[in-house]
């Protein structure tokens, strides 16, 4: 079975990011949050979650993705938006489909 890591680039997402993490919690995915020169409120909002936080200084979205990908130790990774625009159920379906093909 393939494991999945989620990479979530974020900047100033104190309102939406905790909700996204809560929605992902039941799926037990490894989660990297890449914070790109974010505000203190975002850091405070997610500091107690079981996620790995990667800090970077204003390098932008592309570099945030690269940093997250470099940290991955699983066969699969997925970029997930911090604003809650993706449904975590779709990730589960995608992973089930991939595993059924192996």
Regions found by a protein language model. Name each.
Residues 1-102:
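Structured catalytic core of nucleotide-sugar glycosyltransferases
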């Amino acid at each position: 079975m393939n494991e999945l890591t989620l990479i979530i680039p974020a900047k100033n997402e104190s309102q939406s990011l905790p909700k996204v993490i809560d929605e992902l919690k039941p799926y037990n995915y490894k989660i990297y949050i890449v914070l790109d020169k974010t505000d203190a409120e975002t850091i405070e909002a997610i500091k107690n979650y079981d996620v790995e936080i990667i800090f970077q200084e204003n390098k932008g979205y592309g570099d945030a993705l690269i940093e997250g990908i470099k940290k991955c130790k699983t066969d699969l990774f997925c970029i997930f938006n911090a604003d809650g625009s993706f449904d975590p159920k779709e990730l589960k379906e995608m992973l089930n489909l991939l595993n059924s093909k192996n």
